[in-house]
Protein backbone atom coordinates (compact mmCIF):
# COMPACT_ATOMS: atom_id res chain seq x y z
CA UNK A 1 0.00 0.00 0.00
CA UNK A 2 1.37 3.42 -0.85
CA UNK A 3 0.31 6.93 0.02
CA UNK A 4 2.18 9.81 -1.56
CA UNK A 5 2.07 13.60 -1.81
CA UNK A 6 -0.73 13.90 0.70
CA UNK A 7 -1.65 17.12 2.43
CA UNK A 8 -4.45 16.87 5.00
CA UNK A 9 -5.87 20.17 6.16
CA UNK A 10 -7.51 19.37 9.47
CA UNK A 11 -7.96 22.96 10.65
CA UNK A 12 -6.71 26.36 9.63
CA UNK A 13 -3.65 25.70 11.78
CA UNK A 14 -2.98 22.10 10.80
CA UNK A 15 -1.53 20.75 7.58
CA UNK A 16 -0.03 17.27 7.61
CA UNK A 17 2.17 16.22 4.70
CA UNK A 18 3.11 12.56 4.36
CA UNK A 19 4.73 10.25 1.86
CA UNK A 20 5.15 6.57 2.63
CA UNK A 21 4.67 3.02 1.37
CA UNK A 22 3.94 -0.41 2.87
CA UNK A 23 5.16 -3.35 0.83
CA UNK A 24 3.47 -6.73 1.22
CA UNK A 25 6.71 -8.57 0.54
CA UNK A 26 8.52 -6.60 3.23
CA UNK A 27 9.21 -8.11 6.62
CA UNK A 28 7.75 -4.91 8.09
CA UNK A 29 4.13 -5.94 7.86
CA UNK A 30 2.89 -4.05 10.92
CA UNK A 31 3.26 -0.32 11.43
CA UNK A 32 2.40 1.84 14.42
CA UNK A 33 1.97 5.59 14.15
CA UNK A 34 1.94 7.58 17.34
CA UNK A 35 2.04 11.18 18.64
CA UNK A 36 0.47 14.32 17.19
CA UNK A 37 -2.23 14.25 14.47
CA UNK A 38 -2.82 10.46 14.59
CA UNK A 39 -6.55 10.49 13.84
CA UNK A 40 -6.18 12.53 10.67
CA UNK A 41 -3.61 10.06 9.36
CA UNK A 42 -5.95 7.12 9.85
CA UNK A 43 -8.81 9.02 8.25
CA UNK A 44 -6.65 9.88 5.28
CA UNK A 45 -5.48 6.31 4.80
CA UNK A 46 -9.10 5.25 4.87
CA UNK A 47 -10.00 8.35 2.83
CA UNK A 48 -12.69 9.46 5.28
CA UNK A 49 -11.47 13.00 4.87
CA UNK A 50 -10.51 14.61 1.57
CA UNK A 51 -6.80 15.42 1.34
CA UNK A 52 -5.81 18.50 -0.59
CA UNK A 53 -3.64 16.32 -2.78
CA UNK A 54 -3.03 12.59 -2.60
CA UNK A 55 -2.29 9.42 -4.47
CA UNK A 56 -3.23 6.18 -2.72
CA UNK A 57 -2.84 2.70 -4.18
CA UNK A 58 -3.12 -0.86 -2.94
CA UNK A 59 -1.63 -3.74 -4.93
CA UNK A 60 -1.46 -1.41 -7.92
CA UNK A 61 -5.12 -0.42 -7.67
CA UNK A 62 -5.85 3.29 -7.45
CA UNK A 63 -7.93 4.13 -4.39
CA UNK A 64 -7.82 7.92 -4.47
CA UNK A 65 -11.36 9.26 -4.40
CA UNK A 66 -12.90 5.79 -4.19
CA UNK A 67 -16.02 5.05 -2.15
CA UNK A 68 -15.89 3.10 1.10
CA UNK A 69 -17.33 -0.11 -0.38
CA UNK A 70 -14.80 0.09 -3.21
CA UNK A 71 -11.94 0.33 -0.72
CA UNK A 72 -13.28 -2.67 1.19
CA UNK A 73 -13.54 -4.65 -2.06
CA UNK A 74 -9.96 -3.66 -2.89
CA UNK A 75 -8.75 -5.11 0.41
CA UNK A 76 -8.68 -2.25 2.92
CA UNK A 77 -10.22 -2.96 6.32
CA UNK A 78 -10.83 -0.11 8.77
CA UNK A 79 -11.60 -0.14 12.50
CA UNK A 80 -12.52 3.47 13.35
CA UNK A 81 -11.86 5.38 16.53
CA UNK A 82 -14.84 4.91 18.83
CA UNK A 83 -15.61 1.52 17.20
CA UNK A 84 -18.85 2.71 15.54
CA UNK A 85 -20.64 -0.62 15.77
CA UNK A 86 -24.41 -0.83 15.23
CA UNK A 87 -25.80 -0.68 18.79
CA UNK A 88 -29.26 -2.07 17.99
CA UNK A 89 -28.04 -4.99 15.89
CA UNK A 90 -26.90 -8.23 17.49
CA UNK A 91 -23.24 -9.17 17.64
CA UNK A 92 -23.84 -11.69 14.88
CA UNK A 93 -25.62 -9.12 12.69
CA UNK A 94 -22.80 -6.63 13.22
CA UNK A 95 -20.24 -9.14 12.01
CA UNK A 96 -22.39 -10.15 9.05
CA UNK A 97 -22.63 -6.49 8.03
CA UNK A 98 -18.91 -6.61 7.28
CA UNK A 99 -19.52 -9.42 4.80
CA UNK A 100 -21.88 -7.43 2.59
CA UNK A 101 -20.69 -7.64 -0.99
CA UNK A 102 -18.79 -10.85 -0.28
CA UNK A 103 -20.09 -14.26 -1.36
CA UNK A 104 -22.85 -15.47 0.97
CA UNK A 105 -21.25 -17.52 3.71
CA UNK A 106 -21.49 -18.09 7.46
CA UNK A 107 -19.25 -16.19 9.85
CA UNK A 108 -15.79 -17.78 9.59
CA UNK A 109 -14.82 -20.01 12.51
CA UNK A 110 -11.58 -18.12 13.13
CA UNK A 111 -13.52 -15.01 14.20
CA UNK A 112 -15.06 -16.78 17.17
CA UNK A 113 -11.85 -18.75 17.77
CA UNK A 114 -9.84 -15.59 18.40
CA UNK A 115 -12.69 -13.62 19.97
CA UNK A 116 -14.65 -16.29 21.91
CA UNK A 117 -16.60 -13.69 23.89
CA UNK A 118 -18.34 -12.71 20.65
CA UNK A 119 -19.66 -16.24 20.23
CA UNK A 120 -20.96 -16.25 23.79
CA UNK A 121 -22.73 -12.94 23.17
CA UNK A 122 -23.65 -13.39 19.51
CA UNK A 123 -27.38 -12.83 20.22
CA UNK A 124 -26.79 -9.77 22.41
CA UNK A 125 -27.23 -6.24 21.08
CA UNK A 126 -23.94 -4.59 20.22
CA UNK A 127 -24.77 -1.57 22.36
CA UNK A 128 -24.97 -3.79 25.45
CA UNK A 129 -21.35 -4.91 25.21
CA UNK A 130 -18.49 -3.43 27.21
CA UNK A 131 -15.97 -1.15 25.49
CA UNK A 132 -13.46 -3.96 25.11
CA UNK A 133 -16.07 -6.33 23.71
CA UNK A 134 -17.25 -3.68 21.25
CA UNK A 135 -13.67 -3.19 20.09
CA UNK A 136 -13.32 -6.92 19.44
CA UNK A 137 -16.60 -6.77 17.54
CA UNK A 138 -15.39 -3.87 15.39
CA UNK A 139 -12.20 -5.77 14.57
CA UNK A 140 -14.17 -8.92 13.73
CA UNK A 141 -16.47 -6.94 11.44
CA UNK A 142 -13.45 -5.62 9.52
CA UNK A 143 -11.75 -9.02 9.38
CA UNK A 144 -14.59 -10.85 7.65
CA UNK A 145 -14.04 -8.74 4.53
CA UNK A 146 -10.65 -10.52 4.17
CA UNK A 147 -8.52 -7.35 4.07
CA UNK A 148 -5.04 -7.12 2.65
CA UNK A 149 -4.40 -4.16 4.95
CA UNK A 150 -6.17 -3.62 8.28
CA UNK A 151 -6.13 -0.07 9.69
CA UNK A 152 -6.95 0.48 13.36
CA UNK A 153 -7.53 3.97 14.74
CA UNK A 154 -6.99 4.30 18.51
CA UNK A 155 -7.98 0.66 19.21
CA UNK A 156 -7.21 0.83 22.95
CA UNK A 157 -9.35 3.88 23.71
CA UNK A 158 -11.55 3.26 26.75
CA UNK A 159 -10.48 -0.37 27.18
CA UNK A 160 -9.14 -2.01 30.33
CA UNK A 161 -5.51 -3.24 30.25
CA UNK A 162 -6.31 -6.97 30.38
CA UNK A 163 -8.49 -6.71 27.26
CA UNK A 164 -5.83 -4.64 25.50
CA UNK A 165 -3.39 -7.52 25.98
CA UNK A 166 -5.94 -10.02 24.66
CA UNK A 167 -6.54 -7.91 21.54
CA UNK A 168 -2.80 -7.55 20.91
CA UNK A 169 -2.32 -11.31 21.19
CA UNK A 170 -5.23 -12.00 18.83
CA UNK A 171 -3.99 -9.49 16.23
CA UNK A 172 -0.48 -10.96 16.23
CA UNK A 173 -1.85 -14.45 15.63
CA UNK A 174 -4.40 -13.29 13.06
CA UNK A 175 -1.98 -11.32 10.90
CA UNK A 176 0.24 -14.40 10.65
CA UNK A 177 -2.64 -16.75 9.92
CA UNK A 178 -4.61 -14.47 7.58
CA UNK A 179 -1.60 -12.80 5.94
CA UNK A 180 -2.71 -9.17 6.17
CA UNK A 181 -0.64 -6.09 6.93
CA UNK A 182 -1.52 -3.98 9.94
CA UNK A 183 -1.43 -0.20 10.42
CA UNK A 184 -2.17 1.08 13.92
CA UNK A 185 -2.64 4.70 14.96
CA UNK A 186 -2.16 4.55 18.72
CA UNK A 187 -1.22 6.52 21.83
CA UNK A 188 -0.62 3.55 24.17
CA UNK A 189 3.01 2.74 23.49
CA UNK A 190 2.93 -0.74 25.06
CA UNK A 191 0.17 -1.83 22.66
CA UNK A 192 1.92 -0.33 19.64
CA UNK A 193 5.14 -2.09 20.55
CA UNK A 194 3.29 -5.38 21.07
CA UNK A 195 1.73 -5.51 17.59
CA UNK A 196 4.03 -3.53 15.28
CA UNK A 197 7.26 -4.33 13.48
CA UNK A 198 8.01 -0.68 12.71
CA UNK A 199 7.19 2.54 14.55
CA UNK A 200 6.66 6.00 13.09
CA UNK A 201 6.49 9.15 15.22
CA UNK A 202 4.55 12.22 14.10
CA UNK A 203 5.32 15.65 15.51
CA UNK A 204 3.67 18.85 14.28
CA UNK A 205 2.30 17.05 11.27
CA UNK A 206 5.49 15.41 10.02
CA UNK A 207 7.18 12.05 10.45
CA UNK A 208 10.14 12.85 12.69
CA UNK A 209 11.37 9.42 13.76
CA UNK A 210 11.21 5.82 12.59
CA UNK A 211 12.41 2.64 14.26
CA UNK A 212 12.12 -1.11 13.78
CA UNK A 213 11.31 -3.65 16.48
CA UNK A 214 14.79 -5.16 16.58
CA UNK A 215 16.52 -1.87 17.43
CA UNK A 216 13.73 0.15 19.04
CA UNK A 217 14.75 2.74 21.62
CA UNK A 218 11.75 2.92 23.91
CA UNK A 219 13.10 5.86 25.92
CA UNK A 220 13.63 7.93 22.80
CA UNK A 221 10.06 7.30 21.68
CA UNK A 222 8.77 8.22 25.13
CA UNK A 223 10.58 11.56 24.91
CA UNK A 224 8.56 12.40 21.80
CA UNK A 225 5.34 11.45 23.54
CA UNK A 226 5.99 13.44 26.71
CA UNK A 227 3.93 16.62 26.85
Regions found by a protein language model. Name each.
Residues 46:
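Helix-to-loop junction immediately C-terminal to a conserved catalytic motif
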Residues 89, 129, 142-143:
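ABC ATPase signature
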Residues 150-154:
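Catalytic Walker B motif of ABC-type/P-loop ATPase nucleotide-binding domains
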